[in-house]
């Protein structure tokens, strides 16, 4: 059992989303790490200037994934509209970053391929959970 699942189950406030919630929390934090590492790897490439858009999207996506993971981890006095907005923003960031990284991944940048995979997983996890929270 993951730490996210253990924390959800041990929280005295009932959680919305069940397994989808734990999956989303884990996907958000995994994606934040992948995006941060991908931005760093892009900076180490021969022509990092050519990767400016990718680096920017990586950093923005990492920030949104991190904050979304923290927001959806909190169950006490939950504000559904806040959670919904965070999930939407995170899914959008993951889509944009994943699309950009996928292009570079197809040209041999393995770090971008891995990051695109993490972005797709997080985007799917956010979209799977978003229905649990009213807009």
Regions found by a protein language model. Give the residues of each.
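Amphipathic alpha-helical hairpins
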Residues: 1-135
């Amino acid at each position: 059992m993951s730490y996210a699942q253990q924390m959800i189950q041990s929280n005295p406030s009932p959680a919305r989303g069940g397994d989808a919630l734990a999956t989303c929390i884990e996907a958000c934090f995994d994606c934040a790490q992948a995006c941060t590492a991908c931005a760093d790897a892009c900076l180490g490439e021969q022509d990092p200037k050519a990767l400016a858009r990718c680096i920017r999207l990586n950093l923005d996506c990492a920030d949104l994934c991190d904050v979304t993971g923290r927001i959806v981890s909190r169950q006490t006095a939950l504000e559904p509209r806040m959670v919904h907005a965070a999930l939407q923003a995170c899914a959008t960031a993951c889509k944009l970053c994943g699309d950009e990284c996928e292009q570079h991944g197809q040209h041999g940048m393995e770090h971008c391929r891995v990051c695109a995979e993490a972005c797709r997983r997080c985007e799917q996890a956010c979209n799977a959970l978003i229905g649990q929270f009213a807009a």
